[in-house]
Amino acid sequence: MGTAGSLSLLKDQIKETLFVSNCDILIDQDYSEVLKYHRENKNEITVVAALKHYPIPYGTIETGENGRLLELIEKPEISFKINTGIYILEPHLLNEIPENVVFHMTQLIKNVNKRNGLVGVFPVSEKSWKDIGDWDEYYQNIHCRSTV
């Protein structure tokens, strides 16, 4: 049913703001802060995003017209936000999820954004987000927690 399709089964049952999370995600974050951000900004959806930094192991080149060099940057680091798979939704959005079809959270977010609904992004640090769907990260988290 996709990452959001099964939520259509809750249409008449959920009356309050709800957290939704992919099953293989952990974040080290005070969830009450995320909820406070969501409510203060009157968002319909809040996406929890992790900040990521990746060093590029090569020099990069930016060019202009006719292939002219504009800038040469040696081994830059790029920074961006990624979707962690954790969301806060207002209950009326459950009515926007079609029944009995594959439907993803990303599509719901795009639909809300397209109609100018309020979609917020709550950033968390790179280290606070754990994707335990990745075996290396899963093992690292199990090992780390067993030594505490």
Residues covered by each model-derived region:
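Short phosphate-binding loop-to-helix
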Residues: 1-19
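Residues at alpha-helix caps and immediate loop-helix transition turns in enzyme cores, especially N-
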Residues: 6, 30-31
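Short, surface-exposed amphipathic charged segments that create phosphate/polyanion-binding patches used
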Residues: 8-9, 61-62, 135-140
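Catalytic-core segments of class I nucleotidyltransferases/pyrophosphorylases
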Residues: 18-19, 26, 32-39, 52-55, ...
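A short, conserved acidic/glycine-rich loop-to-beta-strand motif
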Residues: 41-51
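Conserved hydrophobic/aromatic beta-strand scaffold that supports enzyme active sites
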Residues: 47, 60, 86-88
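Conserved catalytic core of nucleotide-sugar-dependent glycosyltransferases
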Residues: 59-69
